[in-house]
Amino acid sequence: MSSELSVDHLLGIKYLKPEDIELIFKTADHFKEVINRPIKKVPSLRDITIANLFFENSTRTRLSFELAEKRLSADVINFSAASSSVKKGETLIDTVNNILSMKVDMVVMRHPNPGAGIFLSKHVDASIINAGDGAHEHPTQALLDSYSIREKLGDVRGKKVVIVGDILHSRVALSNIFALKLQGAEVKVCGPKTLLPKHIESLGVGVEMNLKTALEWCDVANMLRVQNERMDISYFPSTREYVKQFGLNKKLLDSLKKEIVIMHPGPINRGVEITSDVADSEHAIILDQVQNGVAVRMAVIYLLASKIKQ
């Protein structure tokens, strides 16, 4: 296995090789041990400065990246579009170049426009990590999801994973499909027909419209929220109707003929895509995902920073 990534940026899962994912996971294993020690910090990136640029609201992802960076002893700059010159009409390139002029080595960016990270990587001299670009990709979320499956079930290869909910507007769904397929998992999607992208089968995934049938088939169910903030029209009759057809509750979970692993990338809309008694049950690894997110992001940052230092 190579000791370095094949890419200089993490722009999306589709740019990675299986060997890259394996290297990230092996590195994350090491950092998982580190963050469970009494002293959780390592001096690996004392000479690296990282800017977190968030042009969309975020809680878990932003905090997870910031904690990962500080655990690695990097210098961290946090940028919020809401309180910046972006509000005055400043372009993305001008914003980033102003920040890079302060000798920043790496940029972690969330942006509402698909492909923003790709665009940026072609115009600036810094390593770029995509922390979510519109409804396009969210690579570190997919990596931590696969890492959590690997930790729980031993391997991702050969596992059956169903992604349930708003697939159409979800960057998490797309990145997960790419990551899971790359590692040899079988993938199906389940949700209202109006929330499934056209030609989704072209990505090598199956489509199942019945939630119980999908759950009977899978080893892992990744429950996604309905992204109302990305909708300008109604995609289903009512929330009540959605819950009836695609909400996961304890009664449905208990009716299955086997045990499955429940995941959710957050934020959870309790009582909609998943009930509290399922989200808080022993079947769910939702908080494991959050903890693993720090270790996986430490691994990604460390491996990309290693290429900067060369």
From Swiss-Prot:
Highest taxon of source: Bacteria
Enzyme Commission designation: 2.1.3.2
Gene3D superfamilies associated with the record: Aspartate/ornithine carbamoyltransferase
Binding site for carbamoyl phosphate: 60-61, 110, 138, 141, 266-267
Keywords on record: Pyrimidine biosynthesis, Transferase
Pathway per the UniProt entry: Pyrimidine metabolism; UMP biosynthesis via de novo pathway; (S)-dihydroorotate from bicarbonate: step 2/3
Catalysis performed (reactions): carbamoyl phosphate + L-aspartate = N-carbamoyl-L-aspartate + phosphate + H(+)
Subunit description: Heterododecamer (2C3:3R2) of six catalytic PyrB chains organized as two trimers (C3), and six regulatory PyrI chains organized as three dimers (R2).
Functional description taken from the UniProt entry: Catalyzes the condensation of carbamoyl phosphate and aspartate to form carbamoyl aspartate and inorganic phosphate, the committed step in the de novo pyrimidine nucleotide biosynthesis pathway.
Name of this protein: Aspartate carbamoyltransferase catalytic subunit
Organism: Christiangramia forsetii (strain DSM 17595 / CGMCC 1.15422 / KT0803) (Gramella forsetii)
